[in-house]
């Protein structure tokens, strides 16, 4: 096999950049929704929040507390959907709030709990696409009072139930055909909506992907370690990584590699320094990229006991709820085809609601945001 002439790194960057410009935006992308319903003895009506995220940016939020309800679009590109679209979405998400209230009561019955405590229902669902628009993965998870309740497995055909109460829900969902409805949505309208939202966003703002960053620790002989600061999956390619000690840049002591294409339209880079063992916390890595709202400062963090994946998700969702209650923003799926199929979506929504509401208290346990999605029917029924 003949070896060709090596391609310069700068040329690889130019080729990758030109390829990325033909896409909606380089890298993988996600559309995620979160629902939260909270009941407390001190409030007459449960607090209900629905939030939608495109990648890591919130674009829509619904907040219902008592008799008041607010619906906020928080990204300029969302307005391209038109007033009729969002009026319909407001109606849907308002209806979902009632389903959550009913499910909070149903869960009290399932677990034989009193009305005097505080209880929370959460749902998170969404989908992700890769560089070329193919579905990467989809998911749906439900939780009650913190722990997992039921979660859709990776095959999108079966559920994992956490306890006997969740087993009842799983059985009724399977009998009602709900599993197939969710899989169809996640593989179709969710992905289609994600791609359309990305295209709308591209029309109103320059495409940037902020770097995913972390610091790794590599022991060396004679009491030294190498600290390597990584920046991954960022776009465009221009980025600056520096190491500092006590606020002073270590220009001469930093090993810096050339920015490299990652193969999916994004880029990667790292910078490393050799430091004395035990002095790692004195060194900071600084990352500058136009996709970041402000420069990042990182240190090497000693490893801690890792949590199981779903526990991590629960912790993240819990943190998002607190942020939502305190500052009006919560954290991180769905969307719909281009074209005039709004009526079809509304019909599908009504059909699924009727199909799944087997019990008056049957619909929606969740923190899976549906705000702003005509393609998604009602919130997933937690119990039925």
Curated annotation (Swiss-Prot):
Annotated SMART domains: IGc1
Membrane topology qualifier: Single-pass type I membrane protein
Signal peptide extent: 1-26
GO biological process: antigen processing and presentation of peptide antigen via MHC class I
Extracellular topological domain residue ranges: 27-314
Region annotation (Alpha-3) ranges: 209-300
Keywords for this protein: Disulfide bond, Glycoprotein, Immunity, Membrane, MHC I, Signal, Transmembrane, Transmembrane helix
Organism, scientific name: Mus musculus
Cellular component GO terms, alphabetical: lumenal side of endoplasmic reticulum membrane; MHC class I protein complex; phagocytic vesicle membrane
Membership in a protein family: Belongs to the MHC class I family.
Subcellular localization(s) per the UniProt record: Membrane
Region annotation Alpha-1: where it falls in the sequence: 27-116
PROSITE patterns: IG_LIKE, IG_MHC
Broad class of where this protein is predominantly found: membrane
PANTHER family, per database record: H-2 CLASS I HISTOCOMPATIBILITY ANTIGEN, TLA(B) ALPHA CHAIN-RELATED, MHC CLASS I-RELATED
Keyword Disulfide bond: yes
Name of the protein in its database record: H-2 class I histocompatibility antigen, TLA(B) alpha chain
Biased composition (Basic and acidic residues): 354-364
UniProt region (Connecting peptide), positions on chain: 301-314
SS bond partners: 127-190, 229-285
